Amino acid sequence: NRVAVSVQNNSYSQRLSFSYLDPYFTENGVSVGYNLSFSNYDQSNNNTANYTSSNTNLEAVFGIPLTENDNILFTIGYDKTDLTTFVGSTPEPLIDYLATVLGPSPRFPCFPSGDDDNNATTPPGNDDNNPTSPDPDICGGNQLWPINQFRAATGWGRDTRNDYVLPTRGTLNRAGVEFSFPGSDIAYYKFSYEFEYYRPLNSWLVFKAGTDLGYGDSYGDTGDAGLPFFKNFYAGGPQSVRGFEANTLGPSYGSCIPLAPATTCIPSYLQPLGGAVKVTGSFELLFPKLIEAPGTRISAFLDWGNVFAGSFDYSKYNNSAFGAVFGDEKFSLDAIRLSAGVALQWQAPIGPISISYAFPLNSKYDFDRVEELQFTFGQQF
């Protein structure tokens, strides 16, 4: 049996998690695990929209081996999420989504009014027009949205790669679906598919191809509101389309500085929204023997992809007095971003390290956020 405790703390998140796994719950290899986590995220520090979330997650995971290479996972869990949005800062479409699906949320913090009646014998909060009643409180621009979700997920995986860390042959397939049960505050579903293919071309060169696809939407009582924005897919950065800043591809919401003619403007303070549709992938040439150091290899790559809004309609916000949505909302081939570059992977004693240098081949907008040199340390999940 395995027991683990994990603590994470960085500029945008704090997370404490506990996990227990019995890998041989039955004689035929069925595993059972339990996970409990508490986390806080400040999305404004993570190249996403400006809101915060406080989360409690509890789940049970069942793993069923089908063959030596195939397995199925079943997950059932409960999520308690408290989102905080900020009037004038959180993108208008996000607040509208929550108000439409959950109903209006009162603002906070609230403060008592000043001593408007100028009467020292009455309490400061007394109404100046009616000393027997208090003044109404003045409330700020924060809004709290409590969300309770009961969810389930199932996934299939097939892995024929010859090495988990630095493979040179074989394939990896992963397909999954996640959904919330009817009766949850928001009814949604998500599909995902991941594919990797490795083939040696000779003793010193390996070809790799991969793709990562995703789609999500709402259903049932949530109607056609769309996938909850806090469940969106993201693209850009070391884990998808290198050469662009992490999470910044796809629709973004920002201020609109007018230009002449009045129908045009300059985007400012862009907040990436992610999307309900994800289409990304890569082609890569791996050089496993170019550097003799163990656990190290160099590659040359071509990345492609983007994320799109899906069923959510951002068009009504494009003439908003508060801001507008910029970028590619709907899927199209000319919206697919391309980048090319080189990368170094090193399985260092202190953890995996990856360094890449890439340049975009078809940056479409002036506000595309380019980041040529990217560095990651540790495994990301």
What is each of the regions a protein language model found here?
Residues 271, 275, 328-336, 345-347, ...:
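Short amphipathic alpha-helical interaction segments
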Residues 299, 341-345, 354-356:
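Active-site scaffold segments
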Residues 193, 337-339, 357:
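Secondary-structure boundary/capping motif
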Residues 1, 24-30, 66-70, 195-205, ...:
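Secondary-structure transition/capping motifs at alpha-helix termini
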Residues 284-286, 337-345:
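Short glycine-rich, acidic/polar surface loops and turns
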Residues 89-329, 375-380:
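C-terminal outer-membrane beta-barrel translocator/porin domains of Gram-negative envelope proteins
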Residues 1-172, 242-243, 247-254, 334-335, ...:
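Gram-negative/organellar outer-membrane beta-barrel architecture
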